[in-house]
């Protein structure tokens, strides 16, 4: 898939296809660091990569194309405990991977919160592409609980080079055209206040990610909040919703 994407976009766009760490939180942190550094226009992931991309998209503010997303990696891994080989060559030459109970538990912890940062603003900015002959992941119904746009292709779980070029690439091109990179991000608090996202930064003592944001009312004060708290949902009076919901640029500062 990686080589097909690079070939299809050669001379038009840079395609970054790093080997991901086996452990999911480490993989999330690894991809997040690349996003911070490279400022991509679009995330594309397949299977477990799509599982990770879905969690990152609304947080980093980048649309995502999810190919055959596997939202229950624990179900996939449990019957496969033991030593395996990566299917695609790894840049470090290490083709060995070991699935353990501890690894499965790491995935379980992320599965439990994987949709916590979903927001209405991204309901049409995360697209799903599902293989009609996929025998491994069948999660379109779950996808449609959170997102609105799905497509299908006559292939299996792992797309061939030809399928990537015929289906993934045209959808990626369409997303790049429909959702140009945003230079600024705005959010509305559930109590009504409007804010502008400034940046994500690390707490120097705890290494926790925090969001710096500015009020667009009153004295236009700057605020800092843990990133997880900024993006996650809250429950009030039996209703669950985003604490801060991304929106387009406000027409005024109220």
Can you name each region flagged by the protein language model?
Residues 38, 60:
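Active-site charged/polar residues at nucleotide-handling catalytic sites that mediate phosphoryl
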């Amino acid at each position: 898939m990686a080589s097909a994407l690079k070939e299809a976009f050669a001379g038009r766009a840079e395609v970054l296809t790093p080997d991901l760490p086996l452990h999911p939180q480490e993989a999330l942190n690894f991809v997040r660091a690349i996003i911070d550094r490279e400022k991509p226009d679009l995330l594309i992931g397949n299977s477990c990569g799509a599982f990770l991309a879905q969690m990152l998209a609304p947080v980093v503010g980048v649309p995502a194309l999810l190919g055959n997303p596997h939202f229950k990696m624990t179900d996939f891994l449990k019957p496969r405990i033991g030593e395996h080989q990566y299917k695609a060559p790894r840049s470090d030459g290490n083709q060995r991977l070991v699935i353990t109970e501890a690894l499965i538990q790491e995935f379980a912890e992320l599965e439990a919160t994987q949709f916590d940062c979903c927001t209405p603003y991204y309901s049409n900015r995360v697209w799903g592409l599902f293989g009609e002959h996929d025998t491994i992941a069948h999660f379109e119904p779950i996808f449609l609980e959170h997102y609105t746009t799905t497509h299908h292709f006559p292939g299996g779980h792992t797309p061939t080079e030809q399928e990537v070029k015929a289906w993934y690439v045209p959808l990626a091109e369409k997303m790049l055209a429909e959702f140009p990179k945003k230079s600024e991000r705005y959010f509305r608090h559930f109590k009504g206040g409007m804010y502008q996202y400034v940046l994500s930064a690390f707490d120097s003592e705890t290494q926790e990610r925090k969001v710096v944001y500015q009020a667009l009312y009153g004295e236009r004060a700057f605020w800092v909040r843990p990133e997880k708290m900024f993006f996650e949902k809250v429950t009030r009076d039996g209703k669950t919703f985003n604490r801060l919901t991304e929106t387009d640029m406000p027409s005024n500062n109220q």
